[in-house]
Every structure is written in structure tokens, then in C-alpha cells.
């Protein structure tokens, strides 16, 4: 199932109005293992609808039919020019803002509250998928949740899909106070990483991989984008999600055995 939800709010505050959703229902496989529910966080000054368009146009049905994807818009309208204006119409959104040198952050805590509120109302979600700014945010959340700094009212984030991401703080970036300690030790959360050979965040992506225990990495020849899945990459993605589906199935069986 694919869905897209957007806010209607001002930069100064985060409001939570009714959402408009677009949904496509996917069938469960014969194994009866349920599809992982994934909250998808788009890149800087883009939108959930744009990320949805990119993924559905570049990833094959063999992958998409086994996933339940929900594409959320960031809480804040874009505060400047978007790099994708030539290709996609507005509106565009941001998850949070930073100073020119990425040394000071604004609205990061408000962003955390906004994401958690959506997860409460529309979850539960099993994992997160993030691209660019959405990947920076997603990568930090499992440890922040573990430390009680974010997502304290929703179930544990069980896995991550990180495309063109990096660490908060990164090699060239400052650090929001709430994210202190997000990578103080290896992150024990199953993770799938996409790193582009021509991506300006390639180095940040490589450093991010080192912060996770047993990460799965797909390297591609493209730049800062959602890559098409060639045969080998498709097999890697399918294998990763089959492992996730089994993990979710085993957890459900364990819960039922205790009832």
C-alpha cells in the first residue's frame, strides 16, 4: 500500500490538520507474512508526493508489492529555492532548518514531535525510509528513541532504509541538542544503505554505514537521487525485506505464544 500525506502549516508553528492520502493496496504473499509498514521521509525542499513518484517509477513491482509505504510531507514549507523546481511542481517542504554552515538548527524538536504525532495517529509503523535530509533524520531516530529523546510514545523502530544520508552530526554539519549521542555507539538496528558514486554526500554515507551493526549496503553509479534497482541490487533489497518480514513474523508469533 502506498499513501501520501501532507500538512498545512506555517513555519513558525506545527499544526496537524486532516491529511489527504493516496493509497494503493498490495496483496500479502502466499506465506501470509504481513508487509512491513514503512514511514517514508523525503529530502530537503521536496515532498512526500515527489519521493513517492521517484520510488514507484524506479523500483520494480517485485519490491513494492511486498511493502506498505506511507509518504509524509515535512512540517515546514520550504524557506528557499528548491533544487528540483525544474522537474517537479511545488509545494516543497523541509523537516527542519539550519544555518548556512549547518552549525545551528531550528525547529528540530518540533519536527520530532510532528513525526511522532503522525506515527501515533496513523501507525503503528515498523520502519523508516529516508532520502537526503529525511535519511539524516531517520538514521538518528533509533538511538534517540532508545535514549528517550524521541518517539517515546510509539513502538520501537525496527529497521531503516537510508538513501543518500549521513550522520547528525556529520563531517560538515553541526548537531541539534536532541541528537547528542545518536551515534555514540554502534546502532543495533537492521539497516539498508544506498550510496551513489557521484553523490555529493557519498563520504557522509560511507561514515554512516560504519555506525551500524551489520549494515546492508547497495552502491550505485548515480548521484544524489533514488537509484534504479539493477538485478543485483533488486536481489539485495528483496533479501533484506524478506529478513525483515521473517523478523516481524517471529515477533508476532512470540507475542501470540504469551497470550
PLM features: residue spans?
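N-terminal chloroplast transit peptides
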Residues: 1-18
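Serine-hydrolase catalytic machinery in alpha/beta-hydrolase-like enzymes
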Residues: 28, 35-127
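Gly/Ala-rich beta-loop-alpha elbow adjacent to hydrolase catalytic centers
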Residues: 129-138
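A conserved short beta-strand
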Residues: 150-165
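Acidic catalytic loop of the alpha/beta-hydrolase fold
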Residues: 168-170, 195-203, 224-225
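Short beta-strand/loop motif that positions the catalytic acidic residue
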Residues: 186-187, 192-195
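Conserved loop-alpha-helix segment in the C-terminal half of the alpha/beta-hydrolase fold
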Residues: 197-215
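Catalytic active-site module of serine/aspartate enzymes centered on a nucleophile-bearing elbow/loop
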Residues: 230-259
Amino acid at each position: 500500500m502506498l499513501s501520501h500525506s501532507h500538512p498545512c502549516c506555517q513555519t513558525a508553528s506545527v499544526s496537524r490538520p486532516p491529511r489527504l492520502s493516496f493509497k494503493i493496496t498490495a496483496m500479502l504473499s502466499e506465506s501470509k507474512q504481513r508487509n512491513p509498514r514503512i514511514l517514508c521521509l523525503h529530502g530537503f525542499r521536496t515532498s512526500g508526493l515527489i519521493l513517492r513518484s521517484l520510488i514507484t517509477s524506479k523500483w520494480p513491482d517485485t519490491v513494492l508489492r511486498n511493502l506498505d509505504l506511507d509518504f509524509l510531507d515535512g512540517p515546514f514549507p520550504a524557506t528557499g529555492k528548491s533544487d528540483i523546481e525544474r522537474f517537479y511542481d511545488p509545494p516543497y517542504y523541509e523537516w527542519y532548518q539550519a544555518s548556512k554552515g549547518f552549525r545551528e538548527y531550528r525547529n528540530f524538536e518540533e519536527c520530532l514531535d510532528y513525526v511522532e504525532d503522525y506515527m501515533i495517529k496513523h501507525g503503528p509503523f515498523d520502519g523508516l525510509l529516508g532520502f537526503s535530509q529525511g535519511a539524516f533524520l531517520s538514521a538518528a531516530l533509533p538511538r534517540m528513541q532508545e535514549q528517550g529523546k524521541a518517539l517515546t510514545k510509539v513502538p520501537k523502530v525496527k529497521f531503516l532504509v537510508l538513501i543518500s544520508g549521513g550522520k547528525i552530526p556529520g563531517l560538515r554539519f553541526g548537531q541539534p541538542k536532541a541528537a547528542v549521542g545518536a551515534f555514540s555507539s554502534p546502532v543495533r538496528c537492521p539497516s539498508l544503505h544506498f550510496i551513489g558514486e557521484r553523490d555529493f554526500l557519498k563520504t557522509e554515507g560511507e561514515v554512516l554505514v560504519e555506525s551500524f551493526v551489520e549494515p546492508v549496503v547497495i552502491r550505485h553509479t548515480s548521484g544524489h537521487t533514488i537509484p534504479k534497482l539493477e538485478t543485483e541490487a533488486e536481489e539485495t533489497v528483496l533479501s533484506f525485506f524478506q529478513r525483515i518480514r521473517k523478523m516481524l513474523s517471529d515477533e508476532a508469533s512470540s507475542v501470540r505464544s504469551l497470550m
